[in-house]
């Protein structure tokens, strides 16, 4: 799926402490990020803001993710990945404190944008370190563990609001403390982190799009699928007579499958290859879309939703594995930044595109749009596999 030789690995010894530290860092960071989205929405809702304004405010953070993606490779080369990651953790804590101090939507627009801008480099750098340190023989399972724990962190974030509430400083202090803890863990593990090589041959994020377009389309597909489904499944379910409680429970099962099955998918990738597993994930996701209208009223929808969530996000996990198989050094960093760009773009584009199809043909536009997206990816991956097997002339 890409056009660069795989990096060579000098040792198969796994730096367990360093990998555990990076996973813990990103998990804590994800909890704080997952807490901030619903917390700020609750506050704006109490202030009487319209759903449209609340949505625009929430979009500032992913917009910050997208914009920062173009700067991460250069900033990493200029200041070093370690310094950049530490600065981002500290800046995120300060920005969340500023958001807590000035609870005004107009002030929050730039602050939430900057929060996304600061958060994205930490994810990109952490994923780059994670991929670089993972021995090839264990990369599938390790990236599965990483993906599962990050997803769990985002899921745990909103649950903390049930414990500390959504008013006053307590929820903000939880988020700020998480960002500070993230920086402390980073400080502890930084001496064990690998250095990025190939720094004399920088590649831009835009240039990486030409190097690995199918990989980036896979990331776009995973993000558009997830965000489109989460945003519009309530509309689809209500049109089919499902209660709000049942719809919420099905979405919870969808997310649970995402969290639970990334490790088995990673293990399968080690046996048969990440590209083949990505093809299976895309096909199963498309089949799930086709079965949705039939299975939604039945009990079979529950196990299907569980597997559906796993394979939908599994597309992204397989993309990370392939990124590590084909790139190293500064190209790996640039590739991860391009992944962040593709994820942010897919996450923003997915709901309106899917919603437009629903407006045109009715509620069945949701599974149709998502199935077409996954089907297009499956065709691209299949063509890539066939071309790889074709003998060179």
Please provide the spans of the model-predicted regions.
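Cytoplasmic helix-loop-helix junction between adjacent transmembrane helices
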Residues: 113-149
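A late C-terminal transmembrane helix in Major Facilitator Superfamily
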Residues: 330-359
């Amino acid at each position: 799926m890409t056009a660069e030789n795989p990096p060579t690995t000098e040792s198969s010894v796994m730096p367990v402490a360093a990998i555990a530290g990076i996973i813990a860092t990103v998990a804590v960071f994800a909890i704080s990020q997952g807490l901030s989205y619903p917390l700020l929405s609750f506050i704006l809702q109490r202030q009487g803001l319209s759903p449209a304004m609340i949505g625009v405010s929430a979009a500032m953070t992913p917009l910050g993710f997208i914009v920062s993606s173009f700067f991460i490779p250069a900033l990493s080369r200029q200041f070093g990945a370690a310094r950049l990651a530490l600065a981002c953790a500290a800046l995120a804590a300060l920005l969340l404190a500023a958001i807590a101090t000035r609870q005004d939507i107009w002030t929050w627009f730039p602050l939430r944008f900057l929060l996304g801008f600061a958060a994205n480099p930490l994810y990109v750098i952490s994923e780059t370190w994670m991929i670089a340190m993972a021995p090839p023989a264990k990369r599938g399972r390790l990236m599965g563990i990483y993906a599962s724990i990050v997803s769990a962190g985002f899921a745990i974030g909103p649950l903390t609001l049930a414990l500390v509430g959504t008013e006053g400083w307590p929820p903000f202090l939880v988020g700020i403390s998480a960002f500070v803890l993230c920086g402390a863990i980073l400080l502890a593990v930084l001496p064990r982190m690998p250095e990025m090589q190939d720094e004399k041959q920088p590649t831009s994020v835009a240039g990486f799009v030409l190097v690995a377009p199918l990989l980036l389309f896979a990331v776009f597909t995973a993000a558009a699928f997830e965000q489109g489904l989460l945003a519009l499944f309530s509309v689809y379910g209500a049109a089919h007579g499902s209660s709000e409680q049942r719809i919420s429970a099905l979405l919870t099962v969808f997310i649970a499958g995402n969290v639970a099955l990334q490790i088995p998918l990673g293990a399968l990738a080690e046996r048969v290859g990440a590209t083949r597993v990505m093809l299976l994930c895309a096909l199963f996701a498309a089949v799930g879309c086709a079965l949705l209208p039939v299975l939604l009223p039945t009990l079979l929808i529950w196990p299907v939703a569980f597997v559906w969530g796993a394979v939908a996000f599994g597309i992204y996990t397989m993309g990370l594995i392939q990124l590590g198989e084909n790139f190293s050094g500064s190209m790996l960093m640039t590739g991860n930044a391009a992944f962040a760009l593709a994820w942010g773009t897919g996450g923003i584009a997915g709901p309106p595109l899917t919603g437009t199809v629903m407006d045109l043909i009715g509620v069945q536009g949701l599974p149709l749009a998502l199935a077409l997206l996954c089907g297009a990816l499956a065709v691209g991956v299949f063509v890539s596999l066939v071309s790889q097997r074709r003998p060179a002339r």
